[in-house]
Amino acid sequence: MIFLFRALKPLLVLALLTVVFVLGGCSNASVLDPKGPVAEQQSDLILLSIGFMLFIVGVVFVLFTIILVKYRDRKGKDNGSYNPKIHGNTFLEVVWTVIPILIVIALSVPTVQTIYSLEKAPEATKDKEPLVVHATSVDWKWVFSYPEQDIETVNYLNIPVDRPILFKISSADSMASLWIPQLGGQKYAMAGMLMDQYLQADEVGTYQGRNANFTGEHFADQEFDVNAVTEKDFNSWVKKTQNEAPKLTKEKYDQLMLPENVDELTFSSTHLKYVDHGQDAEYAMEARKRLGYQAVSPHSKTDPFENVKENEFKKSDDTEE
């Protein structure tokens, strides 16, 4: 047993460290706490894959232990029949080639099925008209446009429950990634491109969304709240916003193109009448030039905002280095 423990010690240490690191990153494992049909499908796929792979690892460890114990060198063992000249075993070679292929197929089939099924509205609510929301990433903020309601929000999102949401995802500058873990997986946002993604919330609540792709200095602050409310409350919010929120002018939208953090904002019109970031990949850069912003190396001592007038949307607690 001592010999067995010594032989397995490196593997046990590696397994323990793996568990520690994995669990250390799961203090808020919201991916495994789905609140919508899309996230639930993806969570089921993740758990299926983990279970399948754990089974394979278990089989490998059992076989490893059996071989280690059965064929270990020990006193009184007759090694006379041992023949070091091994010419191969066709049957075994076929087996350990076919098994990995079958494993890959077994994992690929449900994965491909899930990926294709998520390209359309959830089955349970496919007959409902989806709410269209344009999600635009700008360093370091998210802009959400409701074209049918003529509303635009910054760094927060209101959606009705039990209704599919069709996101039209794009970026004004850096390549980003829209991710609301409890509602579904991430999808990339790229300048000059428009990506579609269906998500849905089944429960009233507030869920956290974020940028899942590194975009520079304040990448970690590019988060937003998703407020899932009843259809009635959503309609009330729409009506109130249309009547009370200020209009979004082109000049104000240009200010949002500056690479800064801003607070939550609400407008009773959208930027879609000024620019379609899915077609125009240069708008943000041109807007920054109009405002006097000068892009410089991160190692430069030059202040890129030196010629920029104070941005009325900028967070008051931001500090520039």
UniProtKB/Swiss-Prot annotation:
<dbReference type="GO" id="GO:0004129">
    <property type="term" value="F:cytochrome-c oxidase activity"/>
</dbReference>
<comment type="similarity">
    <text>Belongs to the cytochrome c oxidase subunit 2 family.</text>
</comment>
<dbReference type="GO" id="GO:0005507">
    <property type="term" value="F:copper ion binding"/>
</dbReference>
<dbReference type="GO" id="GO:0042773">
    <property type="term" value="P:ATP synthesis coupled electron transport"/>
</dbReference>
<dbReference type="GO" id="GO:0016682">
    <property type="term" value="F:oxidoreductase activity, acting on diphenols and related substances as donors, oxygen as acceptor"/>
</dbReference>
<dbReference type="Pfam" id="PF02790">
    <property type="entry name" value="COX2_TM"/>
</dbReference>
<keyword id="KW-0812">Transmembrane</keyword>
<dbReference type="InterPro" id="IPR045187">
    <property type="entry name" value="CcO_II"/>
</dbReference>
<feature type="transmembrane region" description="Helical">
    <location>
        <begin position="90"/>
        <end position="110"/>
    </location>
</feature>
<feature type="region of interest" description="Disordered">
    <location>
        <begin position="294"/>
        <end position="321"/>
    </location>
</feature>
<feature type="lipid moiety-binding region" description="N-palmitoyl cysteine">
    <location>
        <position position="26"/>
    </location>
</feature>
<keyword id="KW-0560">Oxidoreductase</keyword>
<keyword id="KW-0732">Signal</keyword>
<feature type="signal peptide">
    <location>
        <begin position="1"/>
        <end position="25"/>
    </location>
</feature>
<dbReference type="InterPro" id="IPR034227">
    <property type="entry name" value="CuRO_UO_II"/>
</dbReference>
<dbReference type="InterPro" id="IPR008972">
    <property type="entry name" value="Cupredoxin"/>
</dbReference>
<dbReference type="InterPro" id="IPR006332">
    <property type="entry name" value="QoxA"/>
</dbReference>
<keyword id="KW-0249">Electron transport</keyword>
<keyword id="KW-0813">Transport</keyword>
<dbReference type="GO" id="GO:0009486">
    <property type="term" value="F:cytochrome bo3 ubiquinol oxidase activity"/>
</dbReference>
<keyword id="KW-0564">Palmitate</keyword>
<dbReference type="InterPro" id="IPR002429">
    <property type="entry name" value="CcO_II-like_C"/>
</dbReference>
<comment type="function">
    <text>Catalyzes quinol oxidation with the concomitant reduction of oxygen to water. Major component for energy conversion during vegetative growth. Subunit II transfers the electrons from a quinol to the binuclear center of the catalytic subunit I.</text>
</comment>
<feature type="compositionally biased region" description="Basic and acidic residues">
    <location>
        <begin position="300"/>
        <end position="321"/>
    </location>
</feature>
<dbReference type="GO" id="GO:0005886">
    <property type="term" value="C:plasma membrane"/>
</dbReference>
<dbReference type="InterPro" id="IPR006333">
    <property type="entry name" value="Cyt_o_ubiquinol_oxidase_su2"/>
</dbReference>
<feature type="transmembrane region" description="Helical">
    <location>
        <begin position="49"/>
        <end position="69"/>
    </location>
</feature>
<keyword id="KW-0449">Lipoprotein</keyword>
<keyword id="KW-1133">Transmembrane helix</keyword>
<dbReference type="InterPro" id="IPR036257">
    <property type="entry name" value="Cyt_c_oxidase_su2_TM_sf"/>
</dbReference>
<keyword id="KW-0679">Respiratory chain</keyword>
<dbReference type="Pfam" id="PF00116">
    <property type="entry name" value="COX2"/>
</dbReference>
<protein>
    <recommendedName>
        <fullName>Quinol oxidase subunit 2</fullName>
        <ecNumber>1.10.3.-</ecNumber>
    </recommendedName>
</protein>
<keyword id="KW-1003">Cell membrane</keyword>
<feature type="lipid moiety-binding region" description="S-diacylglycerol cysteine">
    <location>
        <position position="26"/>
    </location>
</feature>
<dbReference type="InterPro" id="IPR011759">
    <property type="entry name" value="Cyt_c_oxidase_su2_TM_dom"/>
</dbReference>
<keyword id="KW-0472">Membrane</keyword>
